[in-house]
A protein has these predicted regions:
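Basic, polyanion-binding surface patches
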Residues: 2-176
Length: 176
């Protein structure tokens, strides 16, 4: 019988892969930004709730605190390069939509643009902010979901495999 030998490591995040998403935010004056987030997920089914965790020093952080709305734009392999760019450049002095060629589209329930090229857009309203340490967690209620119709089968069932979504694991992007 084969035994497994294990090392004990210091506490760290080992839940991989994680989704890489583009989050759109805006301040109360309507200035918007895109931020790439890997710390995101589902926290409740009914009501539908999600979260994003953002470092306090990020440019988008004050927009989230001020406006309390955001859109999670799922990243396909087609827009992965743009998402990577948005993750390494600050939007403080740069329009990331313009810089990446992504298209702003009006959301249906929030005053934040969504990314037209994203296969799925999840509109969210912040219900609670938890200060955790390096990141603040923005818990949010999902207020609308927009889905690219080409991802639906003839019965209207969503087939996310067609979207070629991107995940992030240990510094690398992977498509599914």
């Amino acid at each position: 019988e084969k035994t497994m030998s294990k090392q004990i490591w210091k506490p760290g995040n080992m839940l991989y892969p994680v989704p890489a998403v583009l989050v759109s935010v805006a301040d109360s004056e309507g200035k918007d930004n895109l931020i790439t987030i890997a710390w995101t997920g589902t926290v409740c089914s009914d009501p539908a709730m999600t979260y994003i965790s953002v470092r306090k020093e990020r440019y988008s952080h004050h927009m989230l605190k001020e406006n309390k709305e955001f859109v999670i734009n799922l990243v396909s392999k087609e827009i992965c390069r743009a998402a990577d760019f948005c993750g390494v450049r600050s939007g403080r002095d740069l329009d990331k939509f313009e810089a990446t060629g992504l298209t702003r589209e009006k959301a249906s329930t929030v005053n934040v643009p969504l990314v037209k090229e994203s296969p799925v857009n999840i509109e969210c309203k912040v219900t609670q902010v938890l200060e955790l340490g390096s990141h603040d967690m923005f818990l949010a209620k999902v207020t609308a979901v927009q889905v690219d119709e080409s991802l639906l089968d003839e019965k209207g069932k969503l087939d996310l495999n067609k979207a070629h979504l991107v995940a992030y694991s240990h510094g690398e992007y992977q498509t599914f």
